[in-house]
Amino acid sequence: MLTGSGPQDRDETIFHHKPFAVIADKLTRSGYGVLRYDDRGVGLSKGNQLNSTSFDFAQDAAAAYHLIKKEYPASSVGFIGHSEGGMIAQIADSLVNGAAFHIYLAGPGISTVDLMIKQNARYLKDIMTEEGVHTYITQLRPIFEVIGGSEELSIKQDAINKQAKRLYNSLDPKDATKVAPSDLAYAMSMSSLVYNKWMTFFFGYEPKRYLTQIMCPILALNGSEDFQVVPANLEAIKRDAIKADVTTIELEGLNHLFQNCKRCTLPEYNMLTETFSEDAMETMVEWLTAKGF
C-alpha cells in the first residue's frame, strides 16, 4: 500500500484517522495479505524524506514488491496507492516489470500541472471573485510549468519571479491579499519552490508516460466530492492505459479521503467520524475477487 503526499506512516495517519489500517484490516479479513510500511524518514524507516522525490518513493515501492515476491514467489502482488501513491504505483510498475494489479484511490490520470490548476480553482472559488479565480489560474499555469521544467535553477527562479509579480498585480487588490500580502512576498514564496526536489519532479510528472505501458488490471476510484483530485481525472486513466483492463468508478458523496462528506471541505476531514467508506472498500474487494485474485 502506497501513501499519499507528505511524510506518512504505514497507517497513512491523517488527523485522527488511520485509513490504511482500516483498509488493510478489511483486505486481511477478506483473505488478502497486505504490506504497509512507513515512508522513508518516517517512523521506523530510515532515509531522507526532504530530499526525496516520487521516483525515489517508487523505488521504495519496488523494493517492497521484490521483498514479497522473494518470500512468496507464486503470489500475485499488486499496488494500492492513494493520491500520490497512485503516481508512485505507476512509476514502480516500470521498475518491477509489471505488477499483478493496480488500485488507484484518487490517483492521478491527468498531468500534475492540470491537476493543481483544477485544485486551486476549486479552492479559490470560495474566497475570490469569479473573475479573480480566472485571472489567477490562467497566469498560475506558466509558474507550475516552469517549476517542473528542466532549465537551470537561476533561469527558473527569474522566470517565476517575473510571472508571479505579473500575476499578483493583475488581480483586484481584494483578491490579491487572499494569496499574499505583497507581490514581492508572493514571488518569493513561488520562486522558492524550485529548490524543492519533490516539487520539481511533481510538477514535471505526466501520468500518460507510464499509464500507456501498464498491462495489468487497473481499478481507479474517485469520490464525486474530491476537489484535490477531481473525478474527471478518471477519464484520462481509462483513455491512456491502453494496454490495461481498466475499471473506473466515481463513488457518490465521497471526498479525497473517501469519507462520506457534508461540506466536503479540507477542514471537514478532521471533523468526520468515518475514516474510510465501507462501500469503497467493498468495491475493492469485489473487484479483486472478480479478477481472480
Write out the residue ranges for each language-model feature.
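Short, surface-exposed "cap/lid" segments of acyl-processing enzymes
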Residues: M1-K26
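Alpha/beta-hydrolase active-site loop
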Residues: P19, L50-E71
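Conserved alpha/beta-hydrolase
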Residues: P19-L44
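Primarily recognizes the serine-hydrolase "nucleophile elbow" in alpha/beta-hydrolase
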Residues: A63-K125, T129
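Accessory cap/linker subdomain of secreted extracellular hydrolases
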Residues: L105-F201, Y205-R209
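Short beta-strand/loop motif that positions the catalytic acidic residue
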Residues: I214, A220-N222
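Conserved alpha/beta-hydrolase "acid-adjacent" motif
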Residues: F227-N233
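Catalytic active-site module of serine/aspartate enzymes centered on a nucleophile-bearing elbow/loop
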Residues: L254-L257, R263-F293
